[in-house]
Amino acid sequence: MKASQFFISTLKEAPADAEIVSHQLMMRAGLIKKLGAGIYNYMPMGLRVIRKVEAIVREEMNRAGAIEMSMPVIQPAELWQETGRFEAMGPELLRIKDRHGRDFVVQPTSEEVVTDVMRQDIRSYKQLPKNLYQIQTKFRDERRPRFGLMRGREFIMKDAYSFDRDQTAAKVSYQNMAEAYRRIFDRFGLTYRAVAADSGAIGGDLSEEFQVIAATGEDAIVYCPTSDYAANMEKAEALAPAGPRPEASQALAKTPTPGKATCADVAALLGIPLKTTVKSLVLATDLTNEAGEVVKTQVWLLLLRGDHDMNEIKVGKVPGLDASFRFASLAEIDDHFGCEPGYLGPLSLKKPVKLVVDREVAVMADWVCGANEADFHITGVNWSRDLPEPDLIADIRNVVAGDPSPDGKGLLAIERGIEVGHVFYLGTKYSRAMNATFLGENGKPQFLEMGCYGIGITRLPAAAIEQNHDERGIIWPDAIAPFTVVICPITPERFPDVKAAADKLYSELLGAGVDVILDDRGERPGAMFADWELIGVPHRVTIGDRGLKEGHIEYQHRRDTAASKVEAAAAFDFLKGKLAL
């Protein structure tokens, strides 16, 4: 490719709405152009990166035995209604009507469609296993799209779906896909972690995220440096507290705490460690009738250590609670506690509530909580003596750095990550809902065992940039760079030898199958170098008249701060070595 024939559009400054480095650099390098909120044109330079990502993903999926297909972007609502996701997915699912008033959705994933395909065609266990995948445009109506391709509304995703005869075979398929994902991300040259995760709206009971490590990542990744344990914050656990609860050593006392409505303020006032305080969080669940009217409300009180935060995913799995819980209203809090938030506690309630105690609080003694009276707290609270032993104890908190790892092999650490892939074992969640069965060896109908596996094709380049950039621009890994080599001749219009040497090297690299671009735009050297450093092509060759007269050209890797001299006659062989050709 010659630069004069290509579409190169770089910017000196990033748009004002570009918040993170990848968004700024993708806009400045001309990889993407914004069309609307969370919707972007993939410009030629950016599309080359995306196509390389797709090619690697496609190669490894095919190698793993998956079969490519393509499913419609617009899907009938009836299929989504069969699984209940038409209502359950909420406003993120874009719903549309055709001219006849029929409901459709714009796909965010395709579990329903692929399950419908399989229930029509799979009749016998002899046809299994099967793994179908597509690389396709998706749409999710994000409330607040941001960070460019990191959290857009329209995006490209690789989604795969495995179908097996039983759980054992399904988990083999799951591991096969997880291994394929490791090969994919290894080929991209990215630093990543595979972490245990919650299945969320997809469903299922076995799930892992593949997280690219980056300081700007939206997700907190929890891991143990001295073991293999890793999970995202939603899923992460600490080792359960061990040993007997300490004996009570303080008397129960009502203590003035004027204007101190947080655990941190109370601890500072009383001169005690924050971890000896207990925070009270009040939730509510509503029972509704068929008309959607609330017929009964249950109020819940959650107790957590003052230095810990509630984990909503874990709370949603507490017996009796589910993901539909909400925070109680001020009126509901006053009705049950007779007090404003900030001074709440489990003692002296006006009305009974259901109590959920974090397992750390369950082993505490002499703790401090609200007195259910403004400007007062209770000190010296103890189980059994002041409160009945808790009936419902659960892990409902986020872990913190320094917690003991649940495998007992060290302490937990936390870093930030960008989710670029996710694998789920679904079981029969979708096949059962859609009655997708096959005849087993015993001749009886059985539900298909499923897994699903996603990779964010358009998110991956953004994640790669977050991990690979400097003050000059992007530093692409070779595998997904828009071009692998750029040749920069200096004023070739004035020096025929420079043009001839550049053309010769260009032809040699093309003949060797190298993705090379020759910058023949006639730009000044400074502007030319600035463009390619911004765009991030990994290997740059500069050919100038003075160097040729001395018998050399200059080579610079994008990560290097200075160029090195290479014998002009050996330039092609030198690059073959660098590119491992």
Swiss-Prot record:
Disulfide bonds: none annotated. Keywords: Aminoacyl-tRNA synthetase, ATP-binding, Cytoplasm, Ligase, Nucleotide-binding, Protein biosynthesis. Its EC number is 6.1.1.15. Pfam families: HGTP_anticodon, tRNA-synt_2b, tRNA_edit. It is found in: Cytoplasm. It is an enzyme of class 6 (ligase). SUPFAM superfamilies: Class II aaRS ABD-related, Class II aaRS and biotin synthetases, YbaK/ProRS associated domain. GO terms for molecular function: aminoacyl-tRNA deacylase activity; ATP binding; proline-tRNA ligase activity. One of its GO terms (cellular component) is cytosol. GO terms for biological process: prolyl-tRNA aminoacylation. The keyword Transit peptide does not apply. The keyword Protein biosynthesis applies. It catalyses: tRNA(Pro) + L-proline + ATP = L-prolyl-tRNA(Pro) + AMP + diphosphate. InterPro entries: aa-tRNA-synt_IIb (IPR002314), aa-tRNA-synth_II (IPR006195), aa-tRNA-synth_II/BPL/LPL (IPR045864), Anticodon-bd (IPR004154), Anticodon-bd_dom_sf (IPR036621), Pro-tRNA-ligase_IIa (IPR002316), Pro-tRNA-synth_IIa_bac-type (IPR004500), Pro-tRNA-Synthase_IIa_type1 (IPR023717). It comes from the Bacteria. HAMAP family: Pro_tRNA_synth_type1. PANTHER family: MITOCHONDRIAL RIBOSOME PROTEIN L39/PROLYL-TRNA LIGASE FAMILY MEMBER, PROLINE--TRNA LIGASE. NCBIfam families: PRK09194.1 (NF006625), proS_fam_II (TIGR00409). Homodimer. Catalyzes the attachment of proline to tRNA(Pro) in a two-step reaction: proline is first activated by ATP to form Pro-AMP and then transferred to the acceptor end of tRNA(Pro). As ProRS can inadvertently accommodate and process non-cognate amino acids such as alanine and cysteine, to avoid such errors it has two additional distinct editing activities against alanine. One activity is designated as 'pretransfer' editing and involves the tRNA(Pro)-independent hydrolysis of activated Ala-AMP. Belongs to the class-II aminoacyl-tRNA synthetase family. ProS type 1 subfamily. Consists of three domains: the N-terminal catalytic domain, the editing domain and the C-terminal anticodon-binding domain. This is Proline--tRNA ligase.
